[in-house]
């Protein structure tokens, strides 16, 4: 039996069905902290479903998801909330919360043992995602990109300090760059790489293959003819696979910075 990597977030043989519809089939991944992993695939491939299973938000119909080799359900939601933060696709809220209120929600799991720097944590998280000026604004009056940056600040605030026991921390992000302008896409991905360098596991659903190629250490590709593919970004994201999964021919080009990107069409 394979030994679980300490701090690893994994799923094995996961299938998710709703009625007769299969949302995800036979998905097995093992993720280790300190790396940026991009989950890629065409629409409907099951990317968000896989992320929700890894977050412990969705119980798989078959298979299991684990953290440190233990079922996510065994950890319990209060404990998981101290170790993983989820940024969903949908960013609207039902009440008139301000941007600062939303970021403060990231500190809610720590309410039983607050630190002395709670206000500073929120301020620094908002500065990192360039939303300080938006603090008093009602979230639902913001643009999609502004909302996304507020929710990213919330996720960062939730995981701000390393765990006293050294346990791994995980940022699980569903299309964090989809609504962002070009500059904020790259600043957000650089920020996520910086957090990975601090030992945080970063898992992001992305649609932009060039962002994944530039910033992700590894990719999980759904929708390939041979099934799920996981591995180092440069090894997996080859033109033949891209054309097979997305049905788009592409040409790799290397920029002046040495990073390979893709031209499509």
Segment roles from a protein language model:
Residues 55:
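Helix-to-loop junction immediately C-terminal to a conserved catalytic motif
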Residues 71-85, 95, 112-113:
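ABC ATPase NBD coupling module
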Residues 9-11, 24-26:
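Conserved structural motif at the start of ABC-family nucleotide-binding domains
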Residues 117-134:
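Conserved ABC ATPase "signature" region
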Residues 63-71:
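Conserved ABC transporter NBD signature motif
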Residues 238-239, 243-265:
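ABC ATPase nucleotide-binding domains
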Residues 40-42:
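The feature captures the beta-strand-to-loop junction immediately N-terminal to the Walker
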Residues 219-234:
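H-loop (His-switch) and adjacent beta-strand-loop-beta switch element
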């Amino acid at each position: 039996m394979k030994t679980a990597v300490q701090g690893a977030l994994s799923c094995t043989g996961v299938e998710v069905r709703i009625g007769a519809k299969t949302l995800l089939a036979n998905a097995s991944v093992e993720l280790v902290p300190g790396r940026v992993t991009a989950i890629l695939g065409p629409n409907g491939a099951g990317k968000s479903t896989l992320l929700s299973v890894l977050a412990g938000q969705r119980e798989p119909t078959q298979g299991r998801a684990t953290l440190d080799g233990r079922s996510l359900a065994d950890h319990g939601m209060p404990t998981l909330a101290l170790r993983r933060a989820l940024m969903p696709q949908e960013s609207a809220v039902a009440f008139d919360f301000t941007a600062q209120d939303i970021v403060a929600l990231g500190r809610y799991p720590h309410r039983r043992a607050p630190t002395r720097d709670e206000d500073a944590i929120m301020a620094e998280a908002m500065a990192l995602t360039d939303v300080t000026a938006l603090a008093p604004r009602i979230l639902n009056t913001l643009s999609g990109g502004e909302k996304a940056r507020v929710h990213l600040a919330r996720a960062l605030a939730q995981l701000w300090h390393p765990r006293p026991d050294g346990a791994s921390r995980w940022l699980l992000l569903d299309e964090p760059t989809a609504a962002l302008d070009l500059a904020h896409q790259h600043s957000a991905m650089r920020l996520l790489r910086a957090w990975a360098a601090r030992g945080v596991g970063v898992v992001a659903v992305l649609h932009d293959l060039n962002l994944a190629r530039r910033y992700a250490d590894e990719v999980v590709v759904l929708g390939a003819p041979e099934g799920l593919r996981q591995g180092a970004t440069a090894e997996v994201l080859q033109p033949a696979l891209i054309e097979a999964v997305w049905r788009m021919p592409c040409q790799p080009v290397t920029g002046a910075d040495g990073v390979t990107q893709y031209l499509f069409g």
